[in-house]
């Protein structure tokens, strides 16, 4: 075997490899001998078929198998000897001319092919004991609990009809019939009867609810609005419309007493038990938010500490996935890059940076896990599947069967578990300091969230 490196640029390598025809012939001959005891050919006793006859019958197919196996074995040996870890599948170029192929399959010429690869760079891991990570922690206050219970009460609030002649105010529930038109023409989905609208809930298109303020039962108004530019229906997006609207009833929200009786309507023994349940839920929510903030901070630190060239093909793949998703969302919303105060080129540059970061962090996390023998057990994956199934009541078996028969979906469940275990490993070594923060600071928008791996 002769190997010549024809390209070495960064992480990209290309080799020209030649395997003598005599080597191929010897391997194919061994396969034919092995085949001798396995095939049945009329006119010959089992195991007595001459190899020469087998070659006439199976020679081309056996040589094709031999060539395929030789390429795999040769590549594996080459990559192992040079310490290469492949970022993507190798690209192999074989002879394509019919005459060359015939010569090769008949064993009359050497096997010569090229293999192009892109490798994962060597990654020097940082000393995680030097990492300083801040852990924001917010205490659940009585006010937080009271606010949470008030939100629950608001969603369970009842409404009662207002007195005759009363007008609708913010917070009232108005039952309406309406017919919408654009340029005088009724449009699909633009009519409704018995529709309930809570003024100020912002559940209808902008401007609709506000124009119901002051309306009385039995009164008809023409509401003039414009559909948002990012409205889900492209035909309606940005269009001015008029809705001939009649109010059939006006109802005011009723005060609801937050007491033991209210707690019992929710299946709890008392108000104290409701407060306990609300506090437990908030504690879990705050802990989840803390975890996300710590993880983002750690990923930022890993990003800073591991600057290397990411395999271009992996970056391209990650970028294309993100960009296709961005374009689909923008097209669906009817938005342009100008609406986002940017240009397509600037947006592409930003998303390519994010793609590069994600690939590098993925490689770093993988390297950490591999060097420290971090694995995900089947039990852990099984628990994740069960959790997914619980989120879809009535379809548990369908979910379970889906993951059992779909290796790719199972891998997608395994990946975040693996990532979290690696993150936990690093946090055990890092210097993590708690910092008391308010609930508002804990949940504040963080640009780093966009780039978290």
Curated annotation (Swiss-Prot):
Organism encoding this protein: Bradyrhizobium diazoefficiens (strain JCM 10833 / BCRC 13528 / IAM 13628 / NBRC 14792 / USDA 110)
UniProt keyword terms in alphabetical order: Cell cycle, Cell division, Chaperone, Cytoplasm, Isomerase, Rotamase
Catalytic activity: [protein]-peptidylproline (omega=180) = [protein]-peptidylproline (omega=0)
Main location class: cytoplasm
Localization per record: Cytoplasm
Cellular component terms per the entry's GO annotation: cytoplasm
One biological process term in Gene Ontology: 'de novo' cotranslational protein folding
Protein name: Trigger factor
GO molecular function: peptidyl-prolyl cis-trans isomerase activity; protein folding chaperone; ribosome binding
InterPro entries xref list: PPIase_dom_sf, PPIase_FKBP_dom, Trig_fac, Trigger_fac_C, Trigger_fac_C_sf, Trigger_fac_ribosome-bd_bac, Trigger_fac_ribosome-bd_sf, Trigger_fact/SurA_dom_sf
Record text about domains: Consists of 3 domains; the N-terminus binds the ribosome, the middle domain has PPIase activity, while the C-terminus has intrinsic chaperone activity on its own.
PANTHER family in UniProt: TRIGGER FACTOR CHAPERONE AND PEPTIDYL-PROLYL CIS/TRANS ISOMERASE, TRIGGER FACTOR-LIKE PROTEIN TIG, CHLOROPLASTIC
Family annotation (HAMAP family): Trigger_factor_Tig
Gene giving rise to this polypeptide: tig
EC number(s) given by UniProt: 5.2.1.8
Role description: Involved in protein export. Acts as a chaperone by maintaining the newly synthesized protein in an open conformation. Functions as a peptidyl-prolyl cis-trans isomerase.
Domain PPIase FKBP-type residue range list: 171-256
Family note: Belongs to the FKBP-type PPIase family. Tig subfamily.
